[in-house]
Amino acid sequence: IFNKLVKKSNYNKRYSQIKKFNSKNKYQKKGIAITPVKFGISFTTIHLNQAGALVHIYTDGSVHLNHGGIEMGQGTHTKIAQLVANSFGLKYEKIQISSTNTSKVPNTSASAASSTTDLNGAAALNAVSKIKTNIENFIKSKYKIYNNKEAIYKNEFIIFGNKSFKFKKIIQEAYLNRVSLSSSGFYSTPKIKFDKKKFLGRPFYYFCYGAAVSEVSIDTLTGETIIDRVDIIHDAGNPVNSALELGQI
């Protein structure tokens, strides 16, 4: 990332140009810096690395979702609803999400440490997984499907090999056959432990990486500062919603 950014931002050439600019200008000055970051994803207070969620499917094929993350404009609700929609093979509009409430999902952790979507999204998917198991067992039993192929949820259909079933229709049939279409979900971050007194252990489950080059100008008489240009590279993995990630940057 660092070397790629040096090249992409033309850092070395700009650094030389800025040195020349500063030597010729008494009051207007420029600066340029490149900064890498390696950011750990998890709470170092280990017990906070847990989350719950609640998912219901209704007979019209819509889904209700509640989780323990706080939406404060960063897009958490949107991203977790997208995760649920993608897992069920539904359109985003089919997911109805209600505001966080401890009467629905108790003992919520803080929405911080860049872990909110990780924790609550995983809890929501855990609930989805339980419901999908119920649905798939019902389909296999009713329609006598004996192969071990994994079910595919896509475009509002549930697909087993060469057989496909409309999601809404199967949900209605499952309800009439007394199949549970609701579940709570839970997630706790694995493989982490940390002794704050000794500063030993594995406090983070994984790291994210990035780097930035910033060029600024300052008027040394007035103190006015202007950000002239910023180049950023993030190793963003597979973003749930690229537009929201760009918005946060």
List the model feature ranges, each with a label.
Residues 1, 7, 13-249:
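Cofactor-binding beta-sheet edge motifs in enzyme active sites
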